[in-house]
A protein has these predicted regions:
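A short SAM/SAH-binding and catalytic strip from SAM-dependent methyltransferases
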Residues: 108-128
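Class I SAM-dependent methyltransferase SAM/SAH-binding core
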Residues: 44-46, 50-98
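A short glycine-rich, Lys/Arg-flanked "PGG" loop and its adjoining helix->strand segment in the class I
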Residues: 127-143
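Conserved Class I S-adenosyl-L-methionine
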Residues: 50, 181-230
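Conserved class I S-adenosyl-L-methionine
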Residues: 1-39, 146-171
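Residues that mark the start of a beta-strand
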Residues: 41-42, 142
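A short acidic, Gly/Pro-enriched loop at the edge of an enzyme's catalytic core
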Residues: 97-109
Length: 230
């Protein structure tokens, strides 16, 4: 089975098939609106992947720029933007810690299930990598703007849990001044077969088996929302 890192590099279409099923109740957009207005905002989406957040936000904001280190993910993102008929978007390969943008050029930075990888993929230097990222956010955001992060608190869980591989990341967010709350972002699939197949593809056999055992056409997921004003 491919790792998640390998999936991001090579499996854009299959990954999008999964992500398109997420948050069937629309809680992500609702949570964002509770934190900050969206209208007339310039938004940067970091680790945008296939455009889960960027494509959702584009109809509501002035301009959105999607950044990701994977050209494969951005290929799908661009296809979705083009199909939408919208023109207020741009998608570019870039690292969270070094964005190809001017100082004080955005009103909102969002990132879904992505900034955490700076900690996960850099176990020996996770704190300094996160500090580099936060410094870059302070550079690119206008005064009194917001960073909003969405991170996992358990897929296949009805109640939120702290994931072991993010044990350093969660308290770091608290230490640097992020507020947080919990939302549900459940996946709603077209069939039980699809639910099992896509869950197994990305999350692994343990969750795939759980979906099959519980006959989950709707896969529960808890997501943490962290936000900070700059």
């Amino acid at each position: 089975m491919p790792t998640q890192e390998e999936i991001y590099k090579t499996e854009g279409d299959k990954y999008e098939a999964l992500i398109a099923r997420e948050d069937h109740q629309g809680n992500i957009l609702r949570a964002l609106r509770e934190i900050t207005p969206l209208e007339n905002r310039v938004v940067y989406d970091l680790g945008a992947g296939t455009g889960r957040l960027a494509c959702m936000l584009a109809p509501h904001v002035r301009h959105v720029r999607a950044f990701d280190i994977s050209e494969e993910m951005l290929r799908v993102c661009r296809e979705k933007f083009t199909a939408s008929g919208l023109s207020n978007w741009q998608a570019d390969v870039a690292d969270h810690r070094q964005l190809p943008v001017e100082d004080a050029s955005a009103d909102l930075v969002v990132s879904g299930w992505s900034v955490a990888y700076l900690a996960v993929w850099n176990p020996d230097s996770w704190r300094s990598e996160l500090e580099k990222w936060l410094g870059e956010m302070k550079r690119v955001l206008r005064p009194n703007s917001y960073i909003v992060l969405f991170e996992s608190l358990g897929t296949g869980n009805e109640l939120p849990i702290k994931l072991e591989h993010l044990r350093d990341y969660y308290p770091w967010l608290d230490q640097v001044g992020f507020q947080n709350k919990v939302i549900r972002t459940d996946y709603k699939f077209d069939s039980l077969d699809e639910a099992e197949y896509l869950s197994r593809f990305f999350f692994g056999d343990e969750l795939g088996d759980k979906v099959k055992k519980n006959n989950w056409g709707i896969l529960p997921e808890c997501t943490g929302v962290w936000w900070k004003q700059i």
